[in-house]
């Protein structure tokens, strides 16, 4: 206050004011500071000072022809005075206003296309809903987030090539655009931006925004998808939050979300197959998300989630060095440990073989709803500082940390036997056995852990065994903090290996991920996920299995047909029929299979009884191991729509309906495709069934007279030759076999020979 008074007194004297306003500043240090370098040292002041002048702007002389000297109010818009040091003229800010109102207009069609990301953002904000503001302590943790909604996922290099090709096509040699997405985007953008008058550099900047994911490491308390991050400054402060629902979704968020769902489904399905790794790769390669191949997305998308990382590891891609346990992400921040296998006894005297980590280590632990710092020594939790959204989340994190610490009192708290199984009915490894046990009920664990008095430290409280907060006592080594623990910020990726059971290890052999870590949460994907692999047909329930199985048979009918007549066993063992078995009542599988296989054998043996529709309809039932019996069926039952539905051996039913006129098959009312050749001729399909006992010699030979129909063939004597009309109106020359013994081989050669003879 004294100082201010003194200054006021000084300023009231006119001499002070005069000195301050008229004296030159000749202190060398000050002059140096404000004149060295091109960088403006005080931009705000400079701007104010410039705008206070009459003509703060310079412009090209041509402006004198384009703008009148005075506006409607008679104010001068430009001065004839030249700008010192250049041949430009001095212009008033009013000229800008005049230009904006009366200047020439440009074609605006390209603006929404070039500035697409901005236009879309405005729409999202206009349609978004801002809710009430709540004042409360915000536990924010820094996470790597996507700050750029609406982008494709190209790498910087790929984007650069696309931009050069679109914006500066003549500046460079032909760009090597390799990926599907690069080519698609380039073509789209070239069409959109034809005759675009916007400065190329600006177009390039804007294209970069559209093509590349921009991530930043920001403190976040709520949603982390890019449509929330773009309004972060509006939705959360230090002590307040504002509810917000975005006014639109963007494809990049949808891809991230759908990728996680697809990866989880694939890992879960692969776990239960005989060769999990091979199955996982087959599924990743045959799946599409929103019309883009999943493997292409995996290569470009930086999403870090357990299932996604397992898929990446299987493809030989690098992943983050952090590891996962109990659904939390662990990152070692200091210390080292060596592993030693040891047998330990649980409280139930069950022996467990556990890899004990010896040594002092510190970790950050980050989950969706709780974060923590853990310091541990060999089989000892030294300190756990934890923060979380609510009691439940904090408890989850404490259990994970206690199990991870491998403390003896945790192992001794086990009651009952540990025999948890994974989806493939294999026993879980011991650490996950313990985790599952305490996730079910941690009461004894918390009770046996022990409590200690605590010091009063700012921002820290204690937590009691019943998970209530306390300022006096706390579980041994455990404190609750008001501030969150930041996610691991590094984007470093490491080379990993994966074994056939999908366990991912770093180069030192530490397990980073395993299928046990994949979340069981079910979600609905935002983009269409198309699983072409038969292993995923069951994902959408029984109806989907039914439709997909029949679609597959129809799509591959040419090969199926040949196998049906030549190698039925190989056909019956096809993996594509596996999902279908789950629809057949267990008790009936073997009987149905035996019945259908016998029926098929009769078709092969008896001339002219080949019936395409019937083979397609019954084929999936022949896949189960057969049981020979005399039972005849007129219909077969499948369990769909919550009850048994019948497929008739002869004729149509709601489950399987073939329309002779349109030649299309509908399964449960859904179209399953068209049959190319007419299934009604008892003689079509591969003529092998018909031409048993005949040798196909080659193309038609007129010497042997007009073509006979198949029914007339029976009249030939052994060794006699004749032309015969088969299936699709082709004529071939055949000879009736002299010996019956070789009849079986005919069906195999017939197929090949008919092909050769008719081509």
From Swiss-Prot:
GO terms for biological process: 7-methylguanosine mRNA capping; cap snatching; DNA-templated transcription; symbiont-mediated suppression of host gene expression; symbiont-mediated suppression of host mRNA transcription via inhibition of RNA polymerase II activity; viral RNA genome replication. InterPro entries: Flu_PB2_2nd (IPR049110), Flu_PB2_6th (IPR049114), Flu_PB2_C (IPR049115), Flu_PB2_CAP-bd (IPR048298), Flu_PB2_middle (IPR049111), Flu_PB2_N (IPR049106), INV_PB2 (IPR001591), PB2_helical (IPR049113). The keyword Transmembrane does not apply. The record marks 627 as: Avian adaptation. Influenza RNA polymerase is composed of three subunits: PB1, PB2 and PA. Interacts (via N-terminus) with PB1 (via C-terminus). Interacts with nucleoprotein NP (via N-terminus). Keywords: Cap snatching, Eukaryotic host gene expression shutoff by virus, Eukaryotic host transcription shutoff by virus, Host gene expression shutoff by virus, Host nucleus, Host-virus interaction, Inhibition of host RNA polymerase II by virus, mRNA capping, mRNA processing, Viral transcription, Virion. Plays an essential role in transcription initiation and cap-stealing mechanism, in which cellular capped pre-mRNAs are used to generate primers for viral transcription. Recognizes and binds the 7-methylguanosine-containing cap of the target pre-RNA which is subsequently cleaved after 10-13 nucleotides by the viral protein PA. Plays a role in the initiation of the viral genome replication and modulates the activity of the ribonucleoprotein (RNP) complex. It comes from Influenza A virus (strain A/Equine/Prague/1/1956 H7N7). This is Polymerase basic protein 2. One of its GO terms (cellular component) is virion component. Pfam families: Flu_PB2_1st (PF20947), Flu_PB2_2nd (PF20948), Flu_PB2_3rd (PF20949), Flu_PB2_4th (PF20950), Flu_PB2_5th (PF00604), Flu_PB2_6th (PF20951), Flu_PB2_7th (PF20952). Belongs to the influenza viruses PB2 family. Transmembrane segments: none annotated. A motif (Nuclear localization signal) lies at residues 736-739. Signal peptide: none annotated.
């Amino acid at each position: 206050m004294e100082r201010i008074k003194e200054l006021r007194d000084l300023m009231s004297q006119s001499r002070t004011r005069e000195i301050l306003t008229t004296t030159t500043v000749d202190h060398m240090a000050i002059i140096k500071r404000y004149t060295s370098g091109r960088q403006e040292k005080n931009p705000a002041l400079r701007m104010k000072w410039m705008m206070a002048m009459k003509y703060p702007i310079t412009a090209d002389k041509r402006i004198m022809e384009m703008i009148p000297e005075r506006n409607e109010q008679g104010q001068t818009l430009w001065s004839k005075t030249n700008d010192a040091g250049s041949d430009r003229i001095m212009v008033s800010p009013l000229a800008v206003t005049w230009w904006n109102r009366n200047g020439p207009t440009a074609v605006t069609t390209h603006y929404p296309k070039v500035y697409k990301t901005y236009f879309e953002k405005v729409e999202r904000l206009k349609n978004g809903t801002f809710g009430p503001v709540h004042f409360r302590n915000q536990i924010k943790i820094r996470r790597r987030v996507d700050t750029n909604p609406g982008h494709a996922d190209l790498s910087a290099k790929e984007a650069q090539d696309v931009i050069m090709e679109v914006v500066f096509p003549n500046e460079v040699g032909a760009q090597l655009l390799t990926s599907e997405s690069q080519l698609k985007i380039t073509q789209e953008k070239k069409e959109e931006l034809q005759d675009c008058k916007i400065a190329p550099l600006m177009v390039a900047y804007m294209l970069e925004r559209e093509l590349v994911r921009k991530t930043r490491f920001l403190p976040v308390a709520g949603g982390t998808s890019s449509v929330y991050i773009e309004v972060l400054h509006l939705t959360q402060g230090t002590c307040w939050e504002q509810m917000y629902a975005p006014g639109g979704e963007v494809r990049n968020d949808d891809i991230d979300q759908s990728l996680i769902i697809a990866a989880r489904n694939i890992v879960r399905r692969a776990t239960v197959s005989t060769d999990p790794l091979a199955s996982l790769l087959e599924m990743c390669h045959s799946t599409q998300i929103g019309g883009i191949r999943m493997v292409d997305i995996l290569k470009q998308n930086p999403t870090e989630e357990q299932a996604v990382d397992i898929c990446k590891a299987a493809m030989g891609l690098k992943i983050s060095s952090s590891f996962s346990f109990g659904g939390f992400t662990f990152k070692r921040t200091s210390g080292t440990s060596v592993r030693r296998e040891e047998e330990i006894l649980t409280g139930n005297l069950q022996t467990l073989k556990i890899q004990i980590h010896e040594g002092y280590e510190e970790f950050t632990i980050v989950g969706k709803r709780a974060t923590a710092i853990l310091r541990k020594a060999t089989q000892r939790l030294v300190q756990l500082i934890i923060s979380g959204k609510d009691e439940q989340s904090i408890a989850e994190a404490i259990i994970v940390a206690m199990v991870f610490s491998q403390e003896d009192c945790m192992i001794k708290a086990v009651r009952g036997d540990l025999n948890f199984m994974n989806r493939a009915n294999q026993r879980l490894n011991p650490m996950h056995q313990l985790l599952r046990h305490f996730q079910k009920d941690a009461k004894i664990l918390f009770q046996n852990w022990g409590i200690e008095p605590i010091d009063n430290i700012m921002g820290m409280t204690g937590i009691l065994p019943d998970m209530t907060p306390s300022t006096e006592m706390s579980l041994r080594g455990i404190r609750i903090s008001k501030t969150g623990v930041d996610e691991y910020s590094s984007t470093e990726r490491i080379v990993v290996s994966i074994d056939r059971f999908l366990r991912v290890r770093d180069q030192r052999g530490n397990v980073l991920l395993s299928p046990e870590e994949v979340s069981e949460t079910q979600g609905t994907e935002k983009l269409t996920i198309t699983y072409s692999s038969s292993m995923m047909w069951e994902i959408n329930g029984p109806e989907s299995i039914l439709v997909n199985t029949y679609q597959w048979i129809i799509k591959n009918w040419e090969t199926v047909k040949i196998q049906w007549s030549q190698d039925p066993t190989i056909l019956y063992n096809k993996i594509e029929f596996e999902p279908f078995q789950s629809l057949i009542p267990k008790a009936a599988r073997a009987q149905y299979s035996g019945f259908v296989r016998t029926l098929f054998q009769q078709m092969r043996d008896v001339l002219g009884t080949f019936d395409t529709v019937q083979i397609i309809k019954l084929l999936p039932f022949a896949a189960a191991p057969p049981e020979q019996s005399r039972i005849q069926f007129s219909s077969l039952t499948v369990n769909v729509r919550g009850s048994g539905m019948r497929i008739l051996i002869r004729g149509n039913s709601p489950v399987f309906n073939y329309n002779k006129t349109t030649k299309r098959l509908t399964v449960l009312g859904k179209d399953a495709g068209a049959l190319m050749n007419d299934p009604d001729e008892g003689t079509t399909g591969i003529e092998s069934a018909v031409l048993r006992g005949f040798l196909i010699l080659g193309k038609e030979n007129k010497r042997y007279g007009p073509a006979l129909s198949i029914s007339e063939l029976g009249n030939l004597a052994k060794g006699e030759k004749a032309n015969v009309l088969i299936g699709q109106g082709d004529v071939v020359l055949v000879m009736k076999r002299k010996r019956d013994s070789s009849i079986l081989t005919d069906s195999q050669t017939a197929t090949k020979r008919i092909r050769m003879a008719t081509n």
